Amino acid sequence: MNDLKLLRSKLSTDTIEELYKNLNLLKKELFNLRFQQALGELKNTSRFSLVKKSIARIKTELTKRSNSEEY
C-alpha cells in the first residue's frame, strides 16, 4: 500500500515527457509478457495486472493534466 502512495506521488511530479516514456516502456513490457505467455515461458502471471494498472494510472494522470490545461 505504501508503494502505491509513492507511485502516485511520483506520477504527479513527473513531467509529461517522462510519463510518455514510462508509458511506452510499460507497453513494451506488456507486449513481451504476452509473447512469453504465448510461448509458455511466463511464470509470474500476476505481472499482467500490475503492468496494466500502471498503464492505466499513467493514462489517467496524462488525462488530468490535459483537462487542466484546457480550462
Curated annotation (Swiss-Prot):
One of its GO terms (cellular component) is cytosolic large ribosomal subunit. Belongs to the universal ribosomal protein uL29 family. One of its GO terms (biological process) is translation. Keywords: Ribonucleoprotein, Ribosomal protein. NCBIfam families: L29 (TIGR00012). It holds the Pfam family Ribosomal_L29. The lineage of its organism: Bacteria, Pseudomonadati, Pseudomonadota, Alphaproteobacteria, Rickettsiales. This is Large ribosomal subunit protein uL29. The gene is rpmC. SUPFAM superfamilies: Ribosomal protein L29 (L29p). It comes from the Bacteria. One of its GO terms (molecular function) is structural constituent of ribosome. CDD domains: Ribosomal_L29_HIP. InterPro entries: Ribosomal_protein_uL29 (IPR050063), Ribosomal_uL29 (IPR001854), Ribosomal_uL29_CS (IPR018254), Ribosomal_uL29_sf (IPR036049).
